[in-house]
């Protein structure tokens, strides 16, 4: 449905070149929810703006539903964009128009008659859970309701693709989840392809079938959500996965951490388990095998794409040789181990 082929985007500040996107290649299948995640400045918003040609790529092609958008005239592009809906972080509703009239706007611009508009807008407001808000104004709506209006408006022209640019980042967690559930329902009912840009791995975990990770304008890693969570290949992927788990180190431990091992200190380690390692009794195995005691300070377990993943912060109480052997054993069994320091 969406093919992004060798896309580059260069911005210029005077004589300085800024490479926002570098040789991006992505193929997004019809009917999927595809997430693109990256930190601020990674290039993800530039990428989604290239998909509907709000930003023209410096080189490369953008193919949507078999049409190369980079080769279209302005008139052809305007017509083709009706197949591409888009929602933003900041809703972009017209404050002087009612909910009904905001959703009706694209239909009015397309020259639809009043009966068609009435029927379509009523149907869409029911779909997004705002059947009782026809005559309300944006100022009287919550953030979540405003985003629902924006979603309904984006669907007014029956697009085949819905682009979501940080659509939940201005919302509280409960409202975010309700909007994500709505997007899943829309994907299921309308078979619409959704390309979603976010900086939150929780969003990817909740809704996406596949994900691409972008850093510094480059495609770092891509795959199904299950593959990325089970077998992350890059440090950036590990960082995003880590952000979905609630782990904290007690303040008194942080104050006692030493950068190197000294007499009377013990290693504090962070263990990352993915895929099969989650269910393996590795912690009890190293305790018996290397005769060390283990104090678990915090741990968390979650699911994404049908895959379990988890993390643990623990202190190892053994002699230096046994502690190091235990750490090596865990690494040999595909556990990512990070020594955070040594607790004195």
UniProtKB/Swiss-Prot annotation:
E.C. code: 7.4.2.11
Compartments, record wording: Cell inner membrane
Membrane topology summary: Peripheral membrane protein
Primary site of residence: membrane
Keywords in alphabetical order: Amino-acid transport, ATP-binding, Cell inner membrane, Cell membrane, Membrane, Nucleotide-binding, Translocase, Transport
Record GO terms (molecular function): ABC-type D-methionine transporter activity; ATP binding; ATP hydrolysis activity
GO cellular component, one term: Gram-negative-bacterium-type cell wall
Domain of life of the native organism: Bacteria
Positions that bind ATP: 38-45
Catalytic reactions on record: L-methionine(out) + ATP + H2O = L-methionine(in) + ADP + phosphate + H(+); D-methionine(out) + ATP + H2O = D-methionine(in) + ADP + phosphate + H(+)
Family according to the record: Belongs to the ABC transporter superfamily. Methionine importer (TC 3.A.1.24) family.
Function of the molecule: Part of the ABC transporter complex MetNIQ involved in methionine import. Responsible for energy coupling to the transport system.
Assembly mode: The complex is composed of two ATP-binding proteins (MetN), two transmembrane proteins (MetI) and a solute-binding protein (MetQ).
PANTHER family in alphabetical order: AMINO ACID IMPORT ATP-BINDING PROTEIN (PTHR43166), METHIONINE IMPORT ATP-BINDING PROTEIN METN (PTHR43166:SF30)
Name listed for the protein in its UniProt record: Methionine import ATP-binding protein MetN
